[in-house]
Structure formats: C-alpha cells, structure tokens
C-alpha cells in the first residue's frame, strides 16, 4: 500500500475548498471573488458599447480577457509588470487562455455589437490561478449578461452552459487533482483542463515537466479533470442560483 500523502492531506481526486462570492466590487456589471483553497482571484466583467475594428458592422459582439497578479500575491513581492514596461509571456498566454475559454460560454451573435472585458486579478497565489480565473470569470460573465438583459441590449440566450477549469498533475507517480503551489512546483506532469458542462473540452494544456506520461495516465488525468470540473460547475450554478447581487438598471428605450 502506498504511503504517499498530498501536501495538504487531501485525497488524490479531491478538490480544495471552493468559494465563489458574487458582487465583490460595486462598479463592474459582474464581479466575483473566487477561492480555490488559498488561491484567491478577483474576476470582473465590464461592458463596452463598441467592438474591435475586426468585428465592426458584423452584428456580433466580442469578449476579451486580461490576467495579472498583484505584487504581493506571492511570498516574495513581484514588481508590477507595468513598472517594468513589459508584460511577461506567461501573462499574455493566460490572458488569451481565459478569453478563449469564456468565448466558449457566450453566443457572440446574441451579444450584439458590445464587448465584454474580463479582468482576472490574482490577490493570492497558491497554484491554479489560471483555472480559478476561468471558473470565476464565468460567473462574472453571467452577471454581466444579466445586467445587459435588464437594459434590453441582449437576449436571454447569450449565455451558454458553464465552462470551468482545473489542474491535474503527476506527483510522485500519483495522479492528483487541483494542485497547490507546493505540488505544482514539483509535478512530474502538469495539466490544465477546460471543460463545458456537457463534458466537452475547450482546451487541454499538458506538459511533461520532469517525466513522460502514458496514454493510460492521460486518461486518468482526463477522468480526474472531468470530476473536478463537474464539481466546479455545480459551485458556479449554486452561486448563480441567488439573485443578481446589485440593483439592475432600467431597460433602455422602454
């Protein structure tokens, strides 16, 4: 019998405690604090009544995303990237990942020529910041669309079924779900999996950091990720079952 114990004592296929708080800030149409254990991310969704040039006169909207980490999000303070005058490649990569993932959760035609800008700011990082960002951003997006529906600018069909994301990895030869930093930093294999409510994949990012992996292990990773995403989608739906957390606007042109 294996004596392997995870860094925080969880079962191999057990998620960290997940918390989703809507209405975390007052200004954006959608605002969420999402927690995966000690990882905390603020996800906001802001609405702009215009689209990028490549979408102009298309009748479709757009969704874009930006990801960043606060200087004190990690144990050692990191200077702001804006102060360095250059955004890191990792930041660009995660921003694009969040945008791609959430575009799978919205009907851009139903959005009209409006843009939803998602901002994911990591307040505290302990592994899984990109997966927490995607999971929380869906809830912020849902609230932003509720706001637009109240204004009469979009139909109720703009929001598609939930999208969530989770990390999986190989730690000391064991497939583990939802890695904290202590595990993520030494994982032999590390993956991030984005899935829809129906079990379809939006994106799979997988790297053999310190080891190769077999087809059988790949299937184990996918099974663990599917379990984790299903739990996260239940958490998203539970959060969204409550009323919109702020006062809704009056319908325009009513």
Curated annotation (Swiss-Prot):
The keyword Transferase is assigned to this record: yes
BP GO terms, sorted: rRNA catabolic process; rRNA processing; tRNA processing
Annotated catalysed reactions: tRNA(n+1) + phosphate = tRNA(n) + a ribonucleoside 5'-diphosphate
Residues where phosphate binds: 90, 128-130
Keywords recorded for this protein, A-Z: Nucleotidyltransferase, RNA-binding, rRNA processing, Transferase, tRNA processing, tRNA-binding
Pfam hit, one: RNase_PH_C
EC numbers, comma separated: 2.7.7.56
PROSITE patterns referenced in this protein's UniProt entry, alphabetically: RIBONUCLEASE_PH (PS01277)
GO molecular function annotation: 3'-5'-RNA exonuclease activity; tRNA binding; tRNA nucleotidyltransferase activity
Family the UniProt entry places it in: Belongs to the RNase PH family.
Protein's job: Phosphorolytic 3'-5' exoribonuclease that plays an important role in tRNA 3'-end maturation. Removes nucleotide residues following the 3'-CCA terminus of tRNAs; can also add nucleotides to the ends of RNA molecules by using nucleoside diphosphates as substrates, but this may not be physiologically important. Probably plays a role in initiation of 16S rRNA degradation (leading to ribosome degradation) during starvation.
Quaternary structure and partners: Homohexameric ring arranged as a trimer of dimers.
UniProt xrefs under NCBIfam families: RNasePH
Name used for this protein in its record: Ribonuclease PH
Taxonomy of the source species: Bacteria, Bacillati, Actinomycetota, Actinomycetes, Mycobacteriales
């Amino acid at each position: 019998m294996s004596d392997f114990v995870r860094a925080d004592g969880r079962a191999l296929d057990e998620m960290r405690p997940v918390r989703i708080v809507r209405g975390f800030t007052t200004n954006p149409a959608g605002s969420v604090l999402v927690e995966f254990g000690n990882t905390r991310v603020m996800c906001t969704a802001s609405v702009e009544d215009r689209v990028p040039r490549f979408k102009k006169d298309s009748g479709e909207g757009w969704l874009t995303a930006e990801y960043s980490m606060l200087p004190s999000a990690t144990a050692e303070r990191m200077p702001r990237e804006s102060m360095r005058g250059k955004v890191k490649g990792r930041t660009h990569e995660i921003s694009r990942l969040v945008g791609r993932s959430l575009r799978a959760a919205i009907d851009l035609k139903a959005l009209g020529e409006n843009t939803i800008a998602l901002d994911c700011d990591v307040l505290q990082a302990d592994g899984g910041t990109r997966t927490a960002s995607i999971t929380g951003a869906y809830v912020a997006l849902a609230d932003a669309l509720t706001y637009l529906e109240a204004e009469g600018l979009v139909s109720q069909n703009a929001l598609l079924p939930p999208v969530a994301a989770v990390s999986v990895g190989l730690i000391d030869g064991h497939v583990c779900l939802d890695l904290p930093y202590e595990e993520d930093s030494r994982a032999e294999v590390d993956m991030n999996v984005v899935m829809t409510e129906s079990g379809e994949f939006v994106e799979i990012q997988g790297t053999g950091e310190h080891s190769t992996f077999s087809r059988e292990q790949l299937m184990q990773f996918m099974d663990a990720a599917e379990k984790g995403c299903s739990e996260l989608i239940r958490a998203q739906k539970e959060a969204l079952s409550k009323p919109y957390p702020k006062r809704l606007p009056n319908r325009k042109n009513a």
